Amino acid sequence: MVHFLVADKDNPGSICSSLHCARENARTLREILPTEAWELLNEFFADCTRNVESAINKRTRFEFLKRIVITLQTIAGMLDGTMNRNDAYTFSMLGRNLERADMTSRIVDVRSAQLLPAETPELRPFESVQWMSVLKSLSGYQMYRLKMRTRVKRTDVLQFLLRDDQFPRSCQFGLMQLERSLTDLPRSEGVLDVLGDAARFIERAPLTTLDQPGLHDLIDKIQLHINNVHDMIAEIYFPSRNVGGARPLLGQARSQGQTQRQSSLSFGEAAKA
C-alpha cells in the first residue's frame, strides 16, 4: 500500500508520479516561473527519485514525507512571494484553492470515518483526542485553538474545517479565494454562479445534527459541488479538454471530476491560458 501511494509510477496519484508531472509542467514554463522555484523543484525531484526507498522503510518514512511537505511549502511560498500578479498567477491560484477545498473535504471524510463511535459512553473521553488528530492532519490544530478558544469538539471542528473564513485550508475559505481569482478573469459569470451554489450549500449544512453516515453523505455532496466548479472552469477556459462537450451534473460520479482536475488545472496548463 505504501509503495502504491508513494512510489508506484503506474499510479497517477502517487507522490512520485505527481512530482514527475509537476516537474514536466514546470520545465515547459521555465521562462514564467521564478528561477529559484524551478531549480528547487528540479533538485527535489532528483532527490526523491534517488531516495524513494526510504519512504518504504518504516524507520525513515516520516523524515522522507516531512521533507516533501517542507519542500513543497517552500516552493508554494516562492511562487506566492515572487510571481507577477498576472493570468499565470491567477490560474495557479484557481488550481491551488480548488484542490485545497477538495482535499480538505476528503481528509475530513476519511479521518472522521476512522474515529471510534462517540455514542459508546466509555469512548466519549477520547472524542476530543480523535478530532484533534483530524485537525493535525490539516495543520489546523493551533489555528483552531486560537480561533475557537475552547476544547476540541466535533461540531466546532467541522465548523472550522468546512466553514471558517480565516483558515486557509477550510473549504469555505478556498471557495472565497476562488471567487476573488475569478473576478479578475473574463467570462466568469457562469462559474461564479456555480461557486455560489457550493458556498451556500456548505453554509446551510446542518453540522450540529449530523451522525457519521450523514456526515459522509454531506461530504459527498460538497465534493460534487466542487467538481461542478472545476467542470465549469474547464469548460470555459480549457475547452479542448471537454471532448464530449457536456458538463457533468451534480449527481454524476465524482471520480471524473477528480481526474480532470489533475489534468486541466495543473499549474503548467493554467499558466499557458
Region locations from a protein language model:
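Alpha-helical transmembrane segments and their helix-helix packing motifs
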Residues: 1-273
